Structures are given as structure tokens and as C-alpha cells.
Amino acid sequence: MGTILKKTLALVLAAVFALGVFAGCDKGGADSTEPDATEPAEEAKVLKVLTLGSSSSVDSNHMINLVAAAEGIGDYEEVMIGTLYYSGCKLYEHVQFLTQDSPVYRLYLSSTKTGDRPPETMDDVTMEMALKFNCWDIIVLQPGGQEAMVDETYTNGNIGIIRKYVEENRMNPLAVYGWHTIGVSSTDPELTAMYPYSPNAYAESAAKYNYDRERMLNERTERMERFVMSDPSYVYVIPTCTAVENAITSYLGQKGIKRDYTHLTDVGRLIASYVWYCELFGIEELTEIKVDTIPKAFLKSTVDKSQDLVLTEGEKAVIMEAVNNTLKNPLKITPSQYTQAPAE
């Protein structure tokens, strides 16, 4: 893709997004220009996060702006979230796409300035375009669901190739890395049958683990401990997988948290977005869930999308418990105390 077309699309992206003024950024420096050495550097007011991922990233990031707008963003004036999406994308596919400069991605963009509406999107984006679209402060990597469970994912060099490309093309040389862990396969027959891409997808991906969710979780946890948690370059680790599994042990179950074999319901998406929010802002414990309603524009799994989804007190209790238990034990599934649906 030519340079002129890339620049044109970047301008279109900015026009479509229209969520506020982006921080200035030079290739050779961080946000804005170099400050005068005699003047104190101005503290950054906008937090910008980009995830290189898949539909699981879209699920998990979908309501971060909604959560952050409700819960507060500290000293920041704005939080901007970007998600570079390709369906079911694995790390090796990211390598293929960046090598060929393939415009195969969809870029999702959201902001706390528009916390009442879901991300805007733009198609036909390359990884380079996404990296250069903004001065991202945090760039998050994410393996595919099955990739996360095998040693080869962490040792075959693909992660290094992606990181090298990021460092060559990012606009902010001070950007740090994050790592996002996604959920494991559902074992509910109705949900596995609803997988939208291939009727054999569940069998192909989970048969090697004998359809054993606990085993899949253990395989993932072991790799996380050995390859990610021990690597200080991952400043942020976002274990949405743990929170999702915590919530599944509640009365909501798999059907209340997942809308098919792998994707999340609206409540599941909110749980994942709360984990992101807490990790980004260093929240150690939630004392309440301030999101009372999911605006209808955000809804995906709810049948009636003509009106906002009002959360029940039971759902809010499960959300807070699942997230808090994840903050305490990020790699351990903690059974819910809410195993019976409340009378509401």
C-alpha cells in the first residue's frame, strides 16, 4: 500500500473517530515536542492503549471506555483504546501480515470522552498504520486461545518479530508492553454448537485436551507463569481469562458469560473490560460497580437491543467478585460464592 494512500486513510480514521484532539507526536520522540530543559515536563493527560489481537480483544476491550467513564480516570483527561482486529488472529498470522504489509485488519477506536457509545471502526488497515495512528503508551500482545497453551508460542521467535516491528514503527519510543490472556473453550454443548465459523472448530481445538477445561486452564497458567509473569518487559498483564472463569462458577454459568464456544455475552464483556480498567489504573480492589446500565448501542448478545440493559444486583455482585478475585489471584480460578440466583 502506497504512502499517500496510508496517509489519506490515517486522515480518514481521524475524521471518522472525531473524539477529540490527539496528542502530537514525532517519530523520534514521545508525546509532543521535547520540553525545554529549564521547564518541568508536563504530565501526560491522555492514556493511549493499543491491542494487537482478535475478536477476543474486541470482546474484552468493548466496554473499557464505558467502565472508565463511570469509574473515573484519575489525573488523565482522556483514555483512548485501540484494538487491531483480525478474526481468530494468531501470533504467526500477525507475523505474516506485517511481513507483507497486508491491509487485512479492522481498527476499533474508543474514548472515555464518548463513554456512552461503542468503538468506531475502520477496515483495510495494516499493522503499521495502526501503530502510527497514535502515540500509543501501551501496546498489548495477545496469543490465540490454543497458542497460549504450548511452549512453541513463546519460543519460536514470532513474539520477537512482532516486538521488533512494533519498535521500528511505533510513534512513542517510550511505549511499554502488555500481555492479554483470553478464555478457554466452552464445554457447554449448546454453546459449542453456536460457534459461528466452523462446526468442527471446537472438536479441532479442544480434542487434544480431551475437552477438559481444567486441563486447558492449567496448561495456560503454567505458560503464563513461565514465560510472561517472569518477563519484566510486560509491564501490564491483563488476565481476563481468569475473571471470566471465576464468573462462570457463579449462578450465571457458561451461558451467562459466553454467547458461543469462545465469545462473551454482554455481561462477560463488561467483566473483561473491568479487568482491563483495574490493571491499567492499578486498582487493587473494587468496592462497587458504578456501571448500572449497558447502553443499547453496546449490546451484542442481548436479544432485545431496542433498550438499554439494566444490570441486576446479582449480576453486579458476580462482576465485582469475579474481578476482585482476579486482582488477588490473577492465575487462579476462585469459585464464586454466588451459586444460587437471587430473588430479584
How does the language model describe each region?
Residues 123-262, 266, 278-280:
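Alpha-helical cap/lid subdomain in secreted, periplasmic
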Residues 58-155:
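Conserved SGNH/GDSL esterase-like catalytic core that processes O-acyl groups on lipids
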Residues 26-28:
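Bacterial signal peptide processing site
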